Amino acid sequence: LLVTSDLQRARQTAAPLAALWTRTPTLAPGFREQGFGLLEGLDVPTIQARHPELWRQWLTHHADFALPGGESLRQFHTRVMDAVVELVAAHAGRRVVVVTHGGVLDMLWRSVRGLSLDGLRECDIPNTGVNRLRWAHGRLHITSWADASHLADLPAQPPTNIARA
């Protein structure tokens, strides 16, 4: 089973795998990136120029802070974990590939590790990295994380300008 966030960038990332497997991905809005509300789609320099106070507040990484029209980390975490539980219930015992976003992966990492939702990200999340998790005894377990070995033969990519870790 191939599941992807319904956002365009995740669908595009899933497309080669879907073609290889000759499967149509199941779209799952629960695996969308965090909702950034008013700041959705804006780049960092634009946010800093137009909304400096919101930018400052967002960088505090408080679990209950939500941008206007967006989700707090706590709301986001709840949505992601609800999506995981729903997926497990619907496909128990099956191997499922989920194409999703860095923020979603951060929520999974924090949940498995028992980490606070406050504070900076504490795990590597390379673009198109492979993370293997399994559901056992009523919870998620990480079996491998941030595997990018499938990218080893590609040319180095320039770093991205992402202000939030």
Regions picked out by a protein language model, each given a short descriptive name:
Residues 87, 94-103:
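Generic beta-sheet signal
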Residues 54-75:
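Short glycine/proline- and acidic residue-enriched helix-loop micro-motifs
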Residues 1-56:
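Phosphate-coordination/substrate-recognition cap region in phosphate-metabolizing enzymes
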Residues 77, 81-89, 109:
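Generic structural signal for well-ordered alpha-helical scaffold segments
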